[in-house]
Every structure is written in structure tokens, then in C-alpha cells.
């Protein structure tokens, strides 16, 4: 995944030993290569193994020298594979990786603490989503297309974020601020797209507009699914719906309180400190909310004595 269709060719060419064995419909075929040249090839034989492909390779030491694999990087990839393929088992460094609940397990793996309500996990044909809210600031998403981790998002993630916010607004029949809904959200979305188009060679951002030729758009496909399934879930789980509502209301209160603090700070910043002793600031600013702001005036005097008396006698 992520090598733009040349992955197996590149690995074969850069391996001192590359073995591949395919199992299909009760038959198997085995071929072994050395630096992309066939050194052993067996005839098709009967087998009782399930369908699949086994690949074994050793990187060419003449090219890579005393190489080693970065276990943390491979482990992250392996985990994503099992999260996206429920029931798949992968063994890596004598450790078994397996997931029964797909994206639900992915969120559990990546959350720094418990969610504020149980993870909402929904699956459909060619689509799966999971979401909850945590205690962190900002938004956190994991998006996938055909098993590819789109770290930069794309059309599917944009549609997912829009659909979740719209569904929650409609469910509670309240015109919440979008930011209040999304703050602290942790979500994951995975879809399958025919002939996906990515915006870069690294396949980290989906650019596809449609799910398949002559099919719905990515946006409509995700909007329809989330609107229907998330709304149904919230109706069936009133306790979760109540916790979600409480979270949004608390975020709204925090935002308004913070907005008030910021407003006061801005108003204080406008009250410029005048270092020139010839200039005296007025008591009431014209751009303030004071009831006598329209009485504020500018006085220009010739000398310090006149200025001093006016400054002391004014009340605006």
C-alpha cells in the first residue's frame, strides 16, 4: 500500500531472495526470485489451503548493507491493517495482532483517556465510522480509503465532519456552533472507492468526487449514511445522546466565557498608555459602550497650565 502499483516489483528487484506462493480455488503456484530473476518455479499443484498469497523476501545486503526494520513504523501499519479488516490476524515479531471491532478498536488504541460517552461505532456497505468526545482540545480524526491511511484527509473526511455536525444539529433541533460540536471530538472514517484519485503520489489525501463511476458522490454517500445511522443510534441510546448534549453545552459555555475574557482584554488594549506627558487620555472613550461616550471631546491648549486645569475639572 502506498507504493503506487510498483511495490511488488521494487521489492523483488531489491531482494536477494523473493518467494511468492499463490493459493486459489484448490490450486497453488510457487516462484522464487533472486534480484528479480527467476531461480525456481514449480508447476501448479493441488492444495487444501484457503485462498491467499504468501510472500517471503530478504532485502539485498549488497544494496542496503547491515539494514534493519523500524519496528514502531511497521507495528503502526500492522495495527491499521487489522483494524480495517475485522477478523484478520497478523503476526509480527512473535506478537499477534487481531481486531474484532474494527474502528472501535482503533479509537480505543489511540485515545489518551476514556471517552465522555461510549464510542459510537457504525458499519454499512463500503463504509465504517466510529466517534466519541474526549477531554483534549481540538479535533482528532483517522481517515482511510481502501485500506490506505489518508493522513491529510480529503473529500471523505470533509464530508464526514460536515455530516456529523449536521446530524447532531438536526437531532437536537438546535443551531449549535459547529466549533462547539467538533471540539474534543475523536473520530474515524473508512470507505471503499472504485478507482480512487489521490492528490499526491503518497496517497495521503483523497481527491475523488465519486464513490464509483455512475455512483453517488463521496459527499452524498457519507452524508446519507451518517445522517441515517447516527440519528438512529442517538434515538436508540438516549443516555449517550444526553452525555453528548451535555458536552456540547459545556463547550458552548466555555467558549462564551472565553469570548468575554478576550473582549475585556481587547478593550483594555485599546486604552493605550500615553507616555507623552503633554497628552492626557480622556475618561470616557468615544468607541466604548459608556452612556456618555458621545460627550467625549478633544481639547487643544497652548500651555501646561491651561491643560492642567481642564484635565482636573473634566468628568468625561
Model-derived segments and spans:
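GHKL-family ATPase ATP-binding module
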Residues: 9-13, 17-316
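Glycine-rich phosphate-binding loop
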Residues: 1
Amino acid at each position: 500500500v502506498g507504493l503506487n502499483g510498483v511495490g511488488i516489483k521494487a521489492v523483488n528487484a531489491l531482494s536477494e531472495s523473493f518467494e511468492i506462493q499463490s493459493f486459489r480455488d484448490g490450486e497453488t503456484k510457487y516462484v522464487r526470485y533472486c534480484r528479480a530473476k527467476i531461480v525456481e518455479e514449480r508447476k501448479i499443484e493441488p492444495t487444501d489451503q484457503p485462498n491467499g498469497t504468501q510472500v517471503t523476501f530478504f532485502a539485498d545486503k549488497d544494496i542496503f548493507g547491515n539494514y534493519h526494520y523500524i519496528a514502531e513504523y511497521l507495528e503502526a501499519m500492522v495495527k491499521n491493517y487489522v483494524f480495517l479488516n475485522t477478523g484478520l490476524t497478523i503476526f509480527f515479531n512473535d506478537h499477534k495482532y487481531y481486531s474484532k471491532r474494527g474502528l472501535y478498536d482503533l479509537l480505543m488504541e489511540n485515545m489518551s483517556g476514556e471517552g465522555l460517552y461510549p464510542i459510537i461505532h457504525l458499519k454499512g456497505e463500503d463504509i465504517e465510522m466510529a466517534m466519541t468526545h474526549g477531554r483534549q482540545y481540538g479535533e482528532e480524526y483517522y481517515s482511510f480509503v481502501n485500506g490506505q491511511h489518508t493522513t491529510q484527509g480529503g473529500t471523505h473526511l470533509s464530508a464526514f465532519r460536515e455530516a456529523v455536525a449536521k446530524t447532531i444539529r438536526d437531532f437536537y433541533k438546535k443551531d449549535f456552533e459547529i466549533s462547539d460540536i467538533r471540539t474534543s471530538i475523536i473520530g474515524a472514517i473508512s470507505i471503499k472507492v472504485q478507482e480512487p484519485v489521490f492528490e499526491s503520489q503518497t496517497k495521503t489525501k483523497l481527491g475523488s468526487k465519486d464513490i464509483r463511476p455512475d455512483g453517488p458522490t463521496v459527499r452524498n454517500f457519507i452524508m446519507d449514511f451518517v445522517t441515517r445511522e447516527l440519528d438512529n443510534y442517538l434515538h436508540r441510546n438516549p443516555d449517550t445522546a444526553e452525555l453528548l448534549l451535555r458536552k456540547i453545552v459545556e463547550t458552548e459555555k466555555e467558549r462564551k466565557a472565553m469570548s468575554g475574557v478576550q473582549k475585556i482584554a481587547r478593550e483594555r488594549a485599546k486604552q493605550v498608555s500615553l507616555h507623552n506627558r503633554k497628552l492626557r487620555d480622556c475618561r470616557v472613550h468615544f468607541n466604548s459602550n459608556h452612556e456618555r461616550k458621545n460627550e467625549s471631546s478633544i481639547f487643544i491648549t497652548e500651555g501646561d497650565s491651561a491643560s492642567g486645569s481642564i484635565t482636573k475639572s473634566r468628568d468625561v
